[in-house]
Amino acid sequence: ISIGLVGSEMCIRDRGMVANQSEIVNDHIAFRTMGVKNLGIKSFEKIFIEHGYKKMDFYHFDLKKLDAYWYAPPSSDLPRIFISELKVNYLSTTAQKIIMKYTDSVKSDPVDGIDLNNSKQVSEYLQTPLWRLPTLKDYDDLMSESEYAAWVIYNRYYLNHYTISVHDLPGEYCNLEKFNHFVKSLGIKLNKSGGEVKVSKDKLLRQSSSVANQIEASFQNGEKKLIAGSYVEFAERSILPEFINLNKSQIMRKHRREGFETGNADKIFESTFT
């Protein structure tokens, strides 16, 4: 995520769109999880609920065998959270056995073992591998059935993507098409699945994303392969019709389209299809 994210943020600052990178609003952060005993959404969401996040809408992705929820932050200066989960029991017996070979080492809910009010412990948890490094063969075998499964078996619970809130940028760059043009001028490749701009049914949520950076991954026995890492998303949330006559200075987060859209998210997942 570092190349695309840091590069685009620095260029946003250098173009004078914002005075510093801290002014770039983070629309949401997304994580991927495995839906197995002691893990998955039920475990991972505790971190955010403990800090005042509210569980919101449910989403299901039939073809990808995924479920997801989004979580509203306790204050508008914090990002939304989007947590998805692979329904492992919907996969083939072969894929399930590969996944369980690694996740069965997690004997209890790991979140229960950390102090959720200790930011250092939470940060360390998010960066600590929950199971051993997979073999390249296991990774490839999972990839042949579920890209999501392969991504998680290697990356574990590492941040999947971060999202720049385009509508909060000044001037012409608050338009997603114009912002995409800027992003492409930096040499960042966009995910074209479903079109460069994914549009919700109500036309009020528009999203784009970069194609995930490829990283050289080291597997068991020292084998290496280029695989998908993380990526950056760009979201434009339109003002709700009932607030369209408000002055621009009055517009707050609550006046804009909330939540997510299954059709959009389904294509955003494919940012790691590299």
Could you say what each language-model-derived stretch is?
Residues 1-7:
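Single conserved hydrophobic/aromatic residue that forms the stacking wall/gate
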Residues 10-11:
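Active-site loops and adjacent core secondary-structure elements that bind or stabilize anionic groups
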Residues 112-231:
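A contiguous, surface-oriented mixed alpha/beta subdomain in the mid-to-C-terminal portion of proteins
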Residues 207-274:
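Long, compositionally biased intrinsically disordered terminal regions
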